[in-house]
Amino acid sequence: MWYSTVSNPRIALIKQGYHILAEYNLVKEELKNIYAIPSYACALHWFGVIFVHSGIYAGSVFRFSILLPDNFPEDASLLTVVFSTVILHPHICPQNRTLDLGHFLKEWRKDQHHIWHVLRYIQAIFADPEGSICTGQAASGDLVVMDEVSNMEALNMLAKSRPEYIKRVQEQAIASRNHIYDRPLTDDPHYIIVEPYCAERHLKFVDQLKSPCWKEATSMDCSQPSEYLGHIDSSRQLDEEEANQLEKLHRTRIVESHRDEAVDSV
């Protein structure tokens, strides 16, 4: 017998679980230097961390949470991204530490948008903060910036006092690294824990993984494997990653359509 998702919340919950699992699979397979995973306690709450390797934010390590709407992905409401610490950036509110996604998305469309789009946007605003506030170029050649953002002080500093902005950001980067190994504030087993590199311990995991790229990196010299992590240094690389994601997404949708048919027939 066929049951609608309206009259059977259990079926709706199962479908939501499949969607979130598909989102996680897309995230974990392609994106570099940014990691996100649903919490064990609630799949609508994701833990995330980004390692910035280039630009004026280079050396920064920022933790964040992603909160999905209760009716994700059907709800048109945008996701909520909240950083764990105060970050100097035009698009991050200094009071509640939330990222303004309104300049990137107007509403959530489940057939077009995915969590990895949001993660890629997070990478982009740190890789090119000037580009994230620019709306065009004046006849004089000066950049035209947005009239209103979440942190107007950061906007004005970036546009008019760039050296001071860079100084503040670099101080912030040092502080972020000093706290990356802090004990977690939650006992959720999916919380992303970062440990100091220990060759004796971590190389054992490398051997167990049998990953050629890791073995090649660790055999080059005595440098830590983290130095060989991929970098997002250009818009071209971001575009290539998006193309790979879209191809993978097409294959995933085919599988999901068959799965939804099977669930609806229960």
Curated annotation (Swiss-Prot):
Record-linked Pfam families: UQ_con (PF00179)
Alphabetical list of CDD domains matching this protein: UEV_AKTIP (cd23814)
UBC core domain segment(s): 15-178
InterPro entries tied to this protein: UBQ-conjugat_E2_core, UBQ-conjugating_enzyme/RWD
Family membership noted in the UniProt record: Belongs to the ubiquitin-conjugating enzyme family. FTS subfamily.
Record-given protein name: Protein crossbronx-like
Originating organism: Drosophila yakuba
Organism lineage: Eukaryota, Metazoa, Ecdysozoa, Arthropoda, Hexapoda
